[in-house]
């Protein structure tokens, strides 16, 4: 097996190198409005520090946004009051950026003019690293084949469709780690440190909301699970796990709440407008777009895999993990399928969080079963 695992690792490395080679040729000026607004948020952080949470258009006195719009031939680039991705807040008398601050903050960690490439390289390296971790958990040829197919696919997904929005790169990194910890929470042998794991997962999911506001729904399955589990069991451990998840989730979304308070006047007011705040409705065009997209394939795989794990009730904690994933899938699918806008990446976060969780939930108990079997067969020493 060690030679097969080494070969699998080499395959992952080849895909990683291909990613890095492709990413190295990217440009930050590709004519996408969202890109410019995320870069503006990063510029505000680099210029004002944490005060960069205030995205009032009046702070473009250095003409950073205007120059970016000019570079993409935006028709009214000199009039920043017409800037895309900005919303007028009548009560605050401010024109502010609509996005949460997390993506801009992460981009601000890299030098201006060279922010997107290192961010996506980092995202690819994180996926590569956890794919290698999955190799260590593979205990049979079949499980290694699963890891090989999964790892190659997710490393590639770090550039396509992830490159469609800068918010996706940090979101994908969070989904990888949260999926791994979720599997450890429910199916790891002994399930030790459940309180700590619940808190870490809550913090990660909360932090993801700062990258994309829709990532709020990634928490749905966890909240539903902890709530229903407490109603059924009424035990202290379940209550503490749910509370720790909820508290750290709130800590994680604190930057977005603070940004809303500064830009919209209240932590619970939104800076979004237009179609993004439209009432839910079923649109046949949106549904057809999802059915014809790679997102549909990933969601079907996640759904079928969840159903198979639900049937594996003999495996410790597998039903619980499947319930969390199922709850997440249902809530997120309802939201995005009734949202009037389609993009090629909207459901990628829930698909990736679900698939990473299911992968490790499949590998961890199987490796432990093999280990227990080998231990049982060892000769007893006199």
Predicted regions and their residues:
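Hydrophobic, aromatic-rich transmembrane alpha-helices
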Residues: 124-135, 226-232, 294-318, 325, ...
